[in-house]
């Protein structure tokens, strides 16, 4: 399960348990109309103290499909988490996605929001 909320120039995604296909469908249902009307989504903040993983291998594959289908339309992604090894995610993601990806510690959520705002929008 996830909580998804829209802010002026970014979307906040907060996983509340292992990720599922339904979670990615829910995110797409909200951001796809924005992409269709505006051509892009300025930012996505993924906030979770510890990454919850996926319910199944099929859900992991659905996550990869979501990234494949949306990465060109999202300008920035902030991963706000204390998950071990999260700091290497931006370097790895840089090889596969067009978005500018940065990692912030969970307690540095305000810094992630400030980074999103620096792209030109306000909360």
Language-model regions, residue ranges each:
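Amphipathic, Lys/Arg-enriched alpha-helical "gate/interface" segment within cytosolic domains
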Residues: 1-123
């Amino acid at each position: 399960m996830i909580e998804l909320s829209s802010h002026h120039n970014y979307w906040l995604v907060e996983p509340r348990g292992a990720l599922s296909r339904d979670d990615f469908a829910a995110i797409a249902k909200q951001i796809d109309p924005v992409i269709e009307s505006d051509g892009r989504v300025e930012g996505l903040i993924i906030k979770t103290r510890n990454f919850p993983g996926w319910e199944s291998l099929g859900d992991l594959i659905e996550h990869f499909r979501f990234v494949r289908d949306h990465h060109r339309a999202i300008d920035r992604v902030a991963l706000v988490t204390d998950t071990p090894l999260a700091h290497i995610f931006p370097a790895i993601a840089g090889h596969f996605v067009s978005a500018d990806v940065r990692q912030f510690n969970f307690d540095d959520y305000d810094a992630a929001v400030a980074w999103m705002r620096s792209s030109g929008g306000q909360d």
